[in-house]
Amino acid sequence: MLKDLNKVRNIGIMAHIDAGKTTTTERILFYTGINRKVGETHDGGATTDWMEQEKERGITITSAAVTCFWDNNQVNIIDTPGHVDFTVEVERSLRVLDGAVAVFDGKEGVEPQSEQVWRQATKYDVPRICFVNKMDKLGADFYFTVGTIEDRLGAKPLVMQLPIGAEDNFDGVIDLLEMKALTWRGVTPIGTEATVEEIPAELADRAAEYREKLLETVAESDEELMEKYFGGEELSIAEIKAAIRKMVVNSEIYPVYCGTAYKNKGIQPLLDAVVDFLPSPLDLGETKGTDVKDPEKVLTRKPSDEEPLSALAFKIAAHPFFGKLTFVRLYSGKVEPGEQVLNSTKNKKERIGKLFQMHANKENPVEVAHAGNIYAFIGLKDTTTGDTLCDANAPIILESMDFPDPVIQVAIEPKTKSDQEKLGVAIQKLAEEDPTFTVHLDDESGQTVIGGMGELHLDVLVDRMKREFKVEANIGDPQVAYRETIRKPVESLSYTHKKQTGGSGQFAKVIITIEPYAPEADELEEGESAIYKFENAVTGGRVPREYIPSVDAGIQDAMQYGFLAGYPLVNVKATLEDGAYHDVDSSEMAFKLAGSQAFKEAVAKAKPVLLEPIMSVEITTPEEYMGEVIGDVNSRRGQIASMDDRAGAKLVKAKVPLSQMFGYVGDLRSKTQGRANYSMVFDSYAEVPANVAADVIAERNGTAS
C-alpha cells in the first residue's frame, strides 16, 4: 500500500461489449505481477469476471476492483461492463474514479455503448486515454478508429503511437514521443518484451507528420512552450509529457495508443501511459460536499490522511463468508478496523469490522485505509450505494449518484411456499446491491413485480435468485396499472339502504353529489389527497355526526373497483348533502353500505372513462436516426415535446403511454443499430382513446373477441 498519493491511480477500463476490455485488464494484471496464469473471457477464466453468469456469457456484469503495481505506482482498476443493461455499474464506478482507459475495437471504431459510456464519463469529468485494441483483427483500421473518436464522440484525440502493419501483419507501434519502433514480431507469448528498433523507412514520413501534430498540440497548450517550439528550439520529453498530462487532467485531449491485448502486443506502453498521464488523487484536488445541517453550504476535503474522514460507498456486494461487502472510495482521512464512523446520508453510526483491498473476488486484509484509495469494508449494516461515510465530528455529505429508473418490469411468482420465503430474502439482498433493481407488490393483481434496466439485467437477476438463493419462480408479464375517473358531475343522487330481517334492521339514507376533481398542488391542505375529496354538507343533524366517517369510508371502498373495468377510481370529489336515519336500525355499517352503493350508482351516470399512465421519455440518439426514432414514437401514440442537441447527439423528449413502451428497449436498439438509449419516468395519467379503451375493457372483463 503506497502512502504517496502522487503514485496512486484509480482507473476504470471502459468500452463497448466485446471491444476486449476484460482481456486488456487480464494482460495488465499479468504484466503487473498479479496473475501468474492469464485468464481468457472466452474460456471463462478471466480474473475480473468472477460471477457464474459472467463466466458463462463471456461478458462483465459487475465492476470488479483490482489493485496492482507498475513502475513503483499503485494502480487500482475497476473493470466495468459494456452492456447497456448494466449502465448502473458503469455509472457508479465512474463516480469514484480519477481516470479511465477507453478501449475501442480496431475494426469497429466507436460503437454504440462506447458513446454511452463516454457520455457517462464526461458527466463525471473523468480524464481518459484511449486504447485501439484488436489491431490484429481482419479489417482493423487505426486511422478510421481515431476518426470515429473525433466525429462520433466530439473528442480531441492525440495520437501517441502509430501501428506497424495491421491484421495478421500487426507487428508493433511507433512511439511518437521517443520516435522509436516497439516491435513484437510473430507469435508473442505473454510476457514478451518489445524490441526497440528504428522506425521502418516506409513509415518515416507518416511518423514525422504525426509527431509534428503532437508537438503543435503540446506547444499550443502553453505560451512558454509555444515560444520555444515556434522559435525553433527542441522540446524535451519531460516538457512534452508534463504538457500532455496537464491537458489530459483537464479533459482537453485524449491520448491514443494501440495494440492487441489477446496477442500480448502494446500493453506495457499502455501501462506507462496510465502512470504518465492519468491523474493521481492529488491532481484532482479537493472533493466537494455539503453541510449536513445546511445543504446550501459547500464543504471541501483535501486528499490527505490528516483531513477528517470522508468516503463514498459506491457498491454493495454479497460475500459467501462475510455477508455484505461495501466498496468505498476514501477521499480524505484514514480509518482502521473497529472504528465507528457516521453515515451522514442516513444519520446513523456504523462500525467497521474488517478492511480489504480486493483482487477481483479475493480479499487482501489491510490495517489502515488511507485517503485516495478504494477498499471493501465489512460490518456496515445500514449503508447502501451512494451513502457518505465520514467523521462524526466533521460531518459532510458527498455528491451521490443518479440512477435511472427501471425501464422494464416483469411479474415474478414463487413456485412453492418455501420459494416464497426465499424469494423475499433474495429480493432484499439483490436490491441492496443494485439501485436499479426495484420491487413492489401490485395491489390489484397481488403479483410481485420486479424492475430493471433491460431484459439481460432481469435475466441475470432471476438467474442469481436461482443459483445463489435456490429460488424457483415463474416469470410473467406485468399488466399496465390503468385507472378510471368521471367526466361530468351527478347531483343529489339519493340512495336508501333498508334491510329488515326480524329484530333490529338496517337503515341509512344518503344524498350525494359527485364531480370531477383535479386540484393544483398548491391548493391542497396538508394531508389532503390530489385524487379524492370528501365534503360533509349535512345540516340540522339529519345524518348524525358519528355516521359521517362511515359514508366517507363506504365511498372510498367503492373507489377501489371502477365501473368500466374494475380499476381504481381517481380524481373524484364526493359531497354528502343530506340523508336520514332511524333511531334503532341505523348503524355505522348501514351508512357505509349506503355511501358505497350511492357512489356506484352515481359513477355509472357520471360518464366514466379509462385513464392510462403516461411516461416522460428521453431518447438520446445520433442525428442520422432522428427520423426513425420520431416516427416510432408517433406510432406508439406518443407526443414529441422537444428536440435538443446534446454532446454530439440529439435529445428527444416525449410523452408516451406505458402500454406502448413494452419491448421498446429492443426496438430502439434495432432501429438505431444500438446507438440510441433512453430513460423514462412516470409523468401523469391521461384519458385512453375510446377505441383503445374498448379493447382494454373487453380484455379485462373477459369479453374480448
Curated annotation (Swiss-Prot):
Example GO CC term: the record gives: cytoplasm
What Pfam families does this protein's entry cite? EFG_C, EFG_III, EFG_IV, GTP_EFTU, GTP_EFTU_D2
TM regions (residue ranges): none
Instruction: Give every tr-type G domain span.
Output: 6-282
Example of a GO MF term? GTP binding
Annotated signal peptide: none
From the Swiss-Prot or TrEMBL record, give the protein name: Elongation factor G
